[in-house]
């Protein structure tokens, strides 16, 4: 999820300047971010379209929530234009990770595989 090297296209130019800055992460952080993404995102149960982005539903699991929190912290460093929200639903309900933002962010996210 969240592939960072994108070809610049007319569509992306129209969306605005959304690009992830991988240099915001040091080598160790980048490696950890990649490991977390590869481990976590196959575990999502649902992708839900939102007015300004996407929501990803995960099973309720304490270690999964902790790992998603770590991933979101690293993601925010390189993609500060994203609003990332983690939510635990009541009564042991699922975890929701929401990736949202200003106009154009949803189109940017839509380019990701699996969305």
Regions found by a protein language model. Give the residues of each.
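A common structural junction motif
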Residues: 73-82, 113-115
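Amphipathic, interaction-prone secondary-structure segments
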Residues: 65-69, 73
């Amino acid at each position: 999820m969240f592939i960072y090297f994108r070809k610049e296209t007319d569509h992306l130019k129209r969306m605005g300047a959304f690009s992830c800055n991988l240099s915001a992460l040091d080598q160790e952080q980048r490696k950890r971010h990649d490991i977390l993404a590869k481990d976590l995102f196959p575990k999502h149960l649902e992708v839900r379209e939102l007015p300004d982005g996407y929501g990803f539903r995960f099973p309720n699991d304490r270690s999964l929530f902790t790992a998603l929190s770590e991933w979101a912290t690293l993601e925010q460093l390189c993609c500060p234009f994203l609003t990332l929200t983690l939510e635990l639903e009541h009564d042991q309900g699922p975890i929701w990770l929401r990736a949202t933002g200003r106009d154009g962010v949803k189109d940017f996210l839509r380019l990701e595989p699996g969305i």
